[in-house]
Amino acid sequence: MRKSVIAGNWKMHMTCAEAKSYLEEFIPLIKNIKDDRKVVIAPPFTAISTFSDHSDFEYLDISSQNIHWEDQGAFTAEISPKMLLEHGVSYAIVGHSEPRKYFSESDEQINKRAVFAQSSGLTPIVCVGETLEQRERGEADRVITRQVEQGLENTDPSNLIVAYEPIWAIGTGKTCEAEDANKICSLIRKLIGFDDVIIQYGGSVKPNNIDEIMSMSDIDGVLVGGASLDPNSFARIANYQ
């Protein structure tokens, strides 16, 4: 049985002091969480040490928001696996729509990040998703197929999370219908060819829609943006019914 992964991506939010206050409020809210799921938070790099130093760290895992495909070198603004592992990081988000959009990150680069994350002992959370224009033209399946085939080449599906994030639903308040999201997640699973691969949905996930999302057969978790910044909101999501 696949274990659900409920992940929060803080993006460029939270100082170390704010992260500490958040954890003090959040951790008691998930102490009795069911054992069929994991909770993961991806704080900014500066706040990762706040997580690893927290006394109740066992209640959740840490993810980075990016990772490079080299252990060291002249790669300004990047971060390497060994730097992250030193702080207890277990996961790394790669291929999020924001670096794809703002920094023109390619499927080839995303693949290099994912492969190196796995070889370094981290689990990559690889994001895929179509734009509104691509969806309206009926190209969603083709776009997702390309991103999966190119972005996941030579990865190990037993140590992998794929997050389906329709770009038009990220931070917009628009949510992909649960059945539609489930169809795409089913497609991703078939493309990968491994039934136990964990597939998340991301895109305006909130406390009022989490139960329906998690009732879908091919959705194994969520990647949450804005709603993960509020400890009560994210705790409700983590404790979905």
From Swiss-Prot:
GO BP terms: gluconeogenesis; glyceraldehyde-3-phosphate biosynthetic process; glycerol catabolic process; glycolytic process
UniProt KW Isomerase keyword: yes
Subunit structure: Homodimer.
Keyword annotations from UniProtKB, A to Z: Cytoplasm, Gluconeogenesis, Glycolysis, Isomerase
Organism of derivation: Prochlorococcus marinus (strain MIT 9301)
Protein name (database record): Triosephosphate isomerase
Known EC number: 5.3.1.1
Disulfide bond residue pairs: none
